Amino acid sequence: MAFCTLHFFSEALNREVSVNAFVPQNREGYKTHGLSDDQTVWQRYTEVELDAAQAGIAVIMPNGDRSFYTDLSSGDRYFTYISKELPEMMTRFFRGISPAREDNYIAGLSMGGYGALKAALTFPQRYAAACSLSGALDIPFMFDTYKVEGEAFYKSIFGSKEDFVGSTNDLFALLKKDAQNGVKLPEIFLSCGTSDRILPCSRRFYEECRMFGIPVSYTEAEGNHNWAFWRQQIKPFIRYIGSKT
């Protein structure tokens, strides 16, 4: 298992970016971070290197800043970067990383959970499975009840709530569209702590999946919106990926 930090110019973001990676061979996984973190947190706060080595998978950890992994009106195309440019760059840098759907997985926590599911629902042909830990999946809910950042912050990314609903950033609209079109979706894994203030986001998404008959693995466990919870909850998903090797 090799660890490396890559620096390259991103056409989507029009600047130099850095990506951390653990790389063995054969399999690939993407980990997206939360709103107040960066690309180093997975390796600093979890046992992801050991878990990935045991599973025999590569782990790619990009920095999404505070973008909600969205193409912003300011010109920074974070979603394009995460979902298109980054995978292409990784297969170019590492011979052992496969572009095949069955070899690619994506996971994230909080804001990153939203980003992971958006990538999986927008480009279901690219991922075998997607995992959201304590995901900020219901953006109107975040507008109304999660005031840590304030409404102006969410508006700067998504526009108004009225603009957001039904847009390409709306996970529930994407899920409905995919279900109605009979799209073969990646396997979906959701997990959230019972003391987490944004638990309603995961519950609502789970119920929507059930309503459309979409298979989903759902876990509620004791815990809050913190690394003590995420450190444990990412392990089953990594083991799942390893079982597919």
Predicted regions and their residues:
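Non-catalytic cap/lid and distal C-terminal segments of serine-dependent acyl enzymes
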Residues: M1-T245
